Amino acid sequence: MSKSSKKKKAVIEERYHGPLITHGVSLVYIKLYPWIALALTGFLYVGGTYEDDLGIFKGLSLFCGFVNILGIIISFIPYLVNAWKTLTYCLIALTVLSLVIGIDFIGLLMVISDGSSIGAKEIYQSPLTPFYVILMMFLFIFACGLYAWYYLPKNQGKVWAFNQVKEGDRKKTWWDNFAIAFAGATIIPSLLTGYIQIAFGVLLGILLTLTLPAVMVDAVYAAIYIRKHPDYEELT
């Protein structure tokens, strides 16, 4: 192995990433995430822009659509990805944000739906909408702040126990039991009262709103890191 190869390998191994994700965000994400997010954006546009007098869902659809289409276009041109690595990582972060928006929109529809057709007017008028939106916004901001804390200089380089839980570990057993108890406490009353759809909508929103920001924050950190280490990664 040449000296340059050894040096590059050392640089690749040294990039820090926070908890919850096994490996740091890679440039290859730009080849997959925009397609998934674009599908959800299409659903957001179809389901949310009808009778959208306030224009909130139209604006969100345009933002998400622009980000995802730009990501798809760039993904077909590896030269641009490698030339604009910082921009690509930022684009990945925005793509993940559009994923969160799309998934939370689906969760919102599950919460407020009564089986009839739903448009923006029904969403705005539902008494459950503000509670769901405020909850998801709070969880999103909390998750972003929590994951960003792990990237502070004083915390970098640490190996977090959260990422080291293995099969048979007591901590894993505790987390599994907690997850089962939480799901049971949410779903069982919903089954008994007939509100299972609402429960799944809330669980979907909570689960992904708390986890996807880990990818988004790491993508932002990667965009900062790549400016100091331009040879860190290449898309082939």
Question: What are the residue ranges of the model-derived segments?
Answer:
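Membrane-water interface of transmembrane alpha-helices
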Residues: 2-3, 67-78, 139-159, 220
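C-terminal halves and exits of single transmembrane alpha-helices
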Residues: 76, 92-122, 132-142
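Cytosolic-side membrane-entry/anchor segment at the start of a transmembrane helix
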Residues: 66-102, 161-163
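N-terminal juxtamembrane cytosolic/stromal segments of multi-pass membrane proteins
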Residues: 1-43, 228-236
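Alpha-helical transmembrane segments and their membrane-interface junctions
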Residues: 43-44, 102-125, 180-205
